Swiss-Prot record:
Name of this chain's protein: DDB1- and CUL4-associated factor 17
Organism, scientific name: Rattus norvegicus (Rat)
GO CC terms: Cul4-RING E3 ubiquitin ligase complex; membrane; nucleolus
InterPro entries: DCAF17
Pathway membership: Protein modification; protein ubiquitination
PANTHER family: DDB1- AND CUL4-ASSOCIATED FACTOR 17
Length: 505
């Protein structure tokens, strides 16, 4: 394993008090986070359950705020005990919030309204309104009516904190049409906005006549990603599509005529017409075939991860260079495990270019580096591995032959055997630079879990925190570490455990 060194925060506190870091705000921030990490990970720090609540709807968490009742109620988890920030008035089912993103003030931009400098929740309602809500008071600051010709359902960042994409539900047509083998020409719509102040980029339709056999599409970092039933994934330049196929430029709040109807763009009942209609298939920037359209890009230099497009290849991952599609040395990664649930792989979110490969009993962190004496080729190697705490257990399988002879054979158990410690969640805490891992062991009818903090650089175990309550494996959704503690959430019950109750080391 890597180096282990117990950090003492007292010298850093003394230097901070003497003003050693006053000339550089970034150094102050990093110093404060280093102190916090030392407090969180020290052996004497104890975490306790300070607050419990119930929710019939899923619980969401963003930057120290916990959202209940479809984002209608917001609770701050920053204080020593969570407190309610606001609760919006009750609304009908058609007005509930379907999805939301937290927007935070950009640096260096002059905004038109003082309220724009405070965090906002960008929310999408069930009846196609896009709202900007104050993250501290719940007041609705802006509202845009999208359209009546489709049902918008999903929000995502195209460019984080700058451009959002609002995606509609897929148009599958009526049951009678499907039975007759006919499909509506438009699969879905993508509405794209620049945020603060809100401005419309355009609404794009994904047409089955242009993108034949298309099954889904999304937008990320200016790239339109289109997925096909054959497993093919194609990438297109969204900017080039806008320049070539935009029918008319639309501005929010301005008058517009469409199909004989006149109205104001972004106001009900007119909404926003679809103004980007692709008539010819644009040239793709890149295409690749992958099982279940699974495709990721990352690393330094750019590489991508796919699974070969054959069912028997499930669980096999190929890591290839984006520039020439060449397979990296040791680029075929297959975790030799026998389990009911598949392992998963993704580029590390810390922008180090590393790769995280998670299986039921191990977490591999892989690094991408140049091949010695060949700078044009790259190789995959292990940076470190986190292993589950398990016993080497085998069961005897007894078989009786036709002649009556008894044959005993050793049989290995499943790698995700619930009675063995199994990894369920792996998450990265960027501010404290910690890799957090949740491991679960099923004991009788209840599951016991613990949350481990590992050094993101070396994989060293820094802290293990048992979760006292039983853990229902079926209901696990995610684990999130905040600056003062952590939240683990379930569909019916959420617990927030915060504030180390121990002296400074």
């Amino acid at each position: 394993m890597g180096r282990t060194r117990k950090a003492n925060v007292c010298p850093r506190l003394s230097r901070r008090a003497l003003g050693f870091y006053t000339r550089d705000a970034g150094v102050v921030q990093r110093t404060n986070l280093g102190i916090l990490r030392a407090l969180v990970c020290q052996e004497s720090t104890k975490f306790k359950n300070v607050w419990t609540t119930h929710s019939k709807s899923p619980i969401a968490y963003e930057r120290g705020r916990i959202y209940f009742d479809n984002y209608r109620c917001c609770v701050s988890s920053v204080a020593s005990e969570p407190r309610k920030l606001y609760e919006m008035p009750k609304c009908s089912k058609s007005e509930k919030i379907e999805d939301a993103l937290l927007w935070e003030c950009p640096v260096g931009e002059i905004l038109p309204d003082p309220s724009d400098y405070k965090s906002s929740l960008i929310a999408l309602t069930a009846h196609n309104w896009l709202l900007r809500i104050s993250a501290t008071t719940g007041e609705i600051l802006e509202k845009i009516y999208l359209a009546s010709y489709c049902k918008f359902r999903y929000l995502s960042w195209d460019t984080p904190q700058e451009v959002i994409a609002v995606k509609s539900a897929q148009n599958k047509g009526s049951a009678a049409a499907r039975q007759a083998g006919t499909q509506p020409p438009v699969l879905l719509y993508l509405a794209v906005f620049r945020v603060l102040p809100f401005s419309l980029v355009g609404i794009l339709e994904i047409n089955r006549k242009v993108f034949e056999n298309v099954t889904d599409a999304t937008l990320s970092h200016g790239i339109l990603i289109v997925m096909y039933s054959s497993g093919l994934v194609r990438l297109y330049s969204f900017q080039a599509i806008i320049e070539q196929f935009m029918q008319q430029k639309l501005d929010l709040g301005c008058a517009c005529s469409q199909g004989g109807t006149t109205g104001t763009v972004g106001e009900a009942p007119f909404g926003i017409p679809c103004n980007v209609k692709i008539t010819d298939s644009p040239p793709p920037l890149f295409e690749v075939s992958s099982l279940e359209n699974a495709f990721q890009i990352g690393g330094h230099p750019w590489h991508y991860i796919i699974t070969p497009n054959k069912k028997k290849q499930k669980g096999v991952f190929h890591i290839c260079a984006l520039k020439d599609n060449s397979l990296a040395k040791n680029g075929i990664q297959e975790m030799e495990c026998c389990s009911l649930e598949s392992d998963w792989i993704y580029f590390h979110p810390d922008a180090s270019g590393r790769i995280i490969h998670v299986g039921p009993n191990q977490v591999k962190v892989l690094k991408l580096s140049e091949v010695e004496n060949n700078s044009s080729q790259h190789q995959i190697s292990e940076d470190f591995v986190i292993w589950a705490n398990r016993e080497d257990r085998k069961e005897n399988l007894i078989t009786v032959t036709a002649s009556g002879r008894v044959v005993k054979r050793n049989v290995n158990l499943l790698d995700d055997d619930p009675e063995q410690e199994t990894f369920k969640v792996v998450d990265y805490e960027d501010e404290l630079n910690l890799l957090s891992v949740v491991a679960v062991t099923q004991i009788d009818a209840e599951g016991k879990a613990h949350l481990d903090f590992h050094c993101n650089e070396y994989g060293t175990l820094l802290k293990s925190i048992p979760l006292v309550e039983s853990w229902d494996v079926v209901c696990i959704t995610t684990g999130t570490l905040s600056c003062k503690g952590f939240l683990y959430k379930r569909h019916l019950l959420g617990h927030v455990l915060v504030s180390p109750d121990s002296p400074v080391p």
